[in-house]
């Protein structure tokens, strides 16, 4: 549309936050093997869609994917989704009775991360079971909405030594992590069976920025905000490392938070970094 209707010769995808991995997913689909079914198995043939490839990509304060980010933020102390406030003390980083304290030992981090992944997979198994039940009773197009509690319990929020950066310690982009963990606003807080599989399932979401990035060979600019309270530095590092591009750049915006709310004075510099990069490649 931009090329045909408005006469643009080159198109640059710009993905901020969650838009970064989605931009990678789009470019991967535009140039590679197209999906013919959704993650839930419903027919949706993207090979019939017109998906023009972009000419470059900007990953701006981007995370690696919705599914991976959610998993890294999930509260692993919840073992029963029907009883979300019955929690295992040793895996509840907000419980003062938890004997494991920051800075966390490597063995505890490994145990915690494994429990987060296990919880994501447990929800996925339940989702697939519910979809199978619906289809078995002739309700192929029916849906079920559900709530996912405890989605702001990343060890990074309780331990500044995890993925260290310039971020304000013991907080997150939604405020106090312990409150945001169960508040009405959060990743995947309100979702559906199909939405879970497409967006939030660690094993089933096709929009996996790190996998998609390996097949993206466009010129790419990765911007990391060093005080980001959502997408910490390892997100930018992982995306940069995964990109298949021979022309790729990584730039740190020192002191910048996720939305530049605290440091509006840094926004002009970030814009200048992007525009200089684009000009150097004849995109402006």
Q: Where are the regions that the model predicts?
A:
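C-terminal alpha-helix
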Residues: 2, 273-284
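Gly/Ser-rich "nucleophile elbow"/oxyanion-hole loop immediately N-terminal to the catalytic nucleophile
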Residues: 2-17, 97-107
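Conserved alpha/beta-hydrolase "acid-adjacent" motif
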Residues: 69, 229-235
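Alpha/beta-hydrolase
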Residues: 92-211
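Short beta-strand/loop motif that positions the catalytic acidic residue
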Residues: 216, 222-224, 228
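Short glycine-rich catalytic loops that host catalytic nucleophiles or stabilize transition states
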Residues: 250-256
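Catalytic histidine-centered segment of alpha/beta-hydrolase-like enzymes
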Residues: 256-269
């Amino acid at each position: 549309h931009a090329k045909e209707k408005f006469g643009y010769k080159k198109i640059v995808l710009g993905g901020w936050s969650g838009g970064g991995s989605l931009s990678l997913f789009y470019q991967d689909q535009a140039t590679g093997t197209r999906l013919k079914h959704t993650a839930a198995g419903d027919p949706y043939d993207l090979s019939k869609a017109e998906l023009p490839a972009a000419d470059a990509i900007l990953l701006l304060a981007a995370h690696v994917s919705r599914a991976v980010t959610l998993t890294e933020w999930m509260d692993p102390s919840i073992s029963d989704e029907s009883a979300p406030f019955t929690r295992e003390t040793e895996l509840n980083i907000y419980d003062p009775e938890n004997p494991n304290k920051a800075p966390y030992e490597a063995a505890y981090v490994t145990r915690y991360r494994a429990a987060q992944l296990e919880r994501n997979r447990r929800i996925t198994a339940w989702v697939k079971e519910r979809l199978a039940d619906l289809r078995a009773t002739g309700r192929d197009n029916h849906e079920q909405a559900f709530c996912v509690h405890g989605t702001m319990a990343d060890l990074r929020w309780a331990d500044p030594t995890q993925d260290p950066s310039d971020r304000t310690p013991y907080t997150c982009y939604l405020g106090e992590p312990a409150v945001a963990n169960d508040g009405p606003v959060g990743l995947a807080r309100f979702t559906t069976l199909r939405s879970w599989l497409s967006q939030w399932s660690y094993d089933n979401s096709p929009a996996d920025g790190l996998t998609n990035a390996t097949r993206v060979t466009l010129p790419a600019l990765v911007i990391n905000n060093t005080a980001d309270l959502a997408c910490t530095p390892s997100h930018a590092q992982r995306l940069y490392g995964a990109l298949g591009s021979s022309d790729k750049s990584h730039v740190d915006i020192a002191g910048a938070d996720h939305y530049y709310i605290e440091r509006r004075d840094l926004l002009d510099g970030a814009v200048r970094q992007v525009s200089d990069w684009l000009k150097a490649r004849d995109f402006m």
